[in-house]
Curated annotation (Swiss-Prot):
Belongs to the type-II 3-dehydroquinase family. InterPro entries: DHquinase_II, DHquinase_II_CS, DHquinase_II_sf. Keywords: Amino-acid biosynthesis, Aromatic amino acid biosynthesis, Lyase. It comes from Marinomonas sp. (strain MWYL1). The keyword Amino-acid biosynthesis applies. This is 3-dehydroquinate dehydratase. Substrate binds at residues 79, 85, 92, 106-107, 116. It comes from the Bacteria. Catalyzes a trans-dehydration via an enolate intermediate.
Length: 150
């Protein structure tokens, strides 16, 4: 049983209390339970991480790359939060570590402020789920497994 890493970027630890009209009332813990259940139903395990620090997320992507090569990890479902719009370093980490990533956004970033319309992550991602609420994580897991035929 391989592992799917679920990575969450800055401020996602505030899910459930931060702008619930935009992000909903589910907490990060709720999302992690949903992810575990979705992965288990597909024969996989989930390992969840959240960090407000870009370097920590880069290190986790590098770790995922090493573990993919070792056959331990399938890929990554990643909500980079605001780093989506600013981080060339995360883009480079994904490309450099050769990690299959499904980019997830809870809200429809294209229906929000103009600065949210550009993603540095998308060109490096295997797929993108946008605007489906926290269900997007489940769709991301399903999409990753389907895309990699695991």
């Amino acid at each position: 049983m391989s592992t799917i890493m679920v990575l969450n970027g800055p401020n996602l630890n505030l899910l459930g209390t931060r702008e619930p009209a935009t992000y909903g009332y589910e907490t990060l813990a709720d999302v992690e339970v949903m992810c575990r259940e979705a992965a288990l139903s597909l024969g996989h395990e989930v390992e969840c991480h959240q960090s407000n620090h870009e370097g920590v997320l880069i290190d986790l992507i590098h770790e995922a790359g090493r573990r993919i090569k070792a056959g331990e990890v399938l890929g990554v479902v990643f909500n980079p939060g605001a780093y989506t719009h600013t981080s060339v370093a995360l883009h480079d980490a994904i490309k450099g570590a050769e990690v299959p990533v499904i980019e997830v956004h809870i809200s429809n970033v294209h229906a929000r402020e103009a600065f949210r319309h550009h993603s540095y992550i998308s060109p490096a991602a295997a797929g993108i789920v946008v605007g489906m609420g926290v269900q997007g994580y489940v769709l991301g897991i399903q999409g990753l497994v389907h895309k990699l035929k695991a």
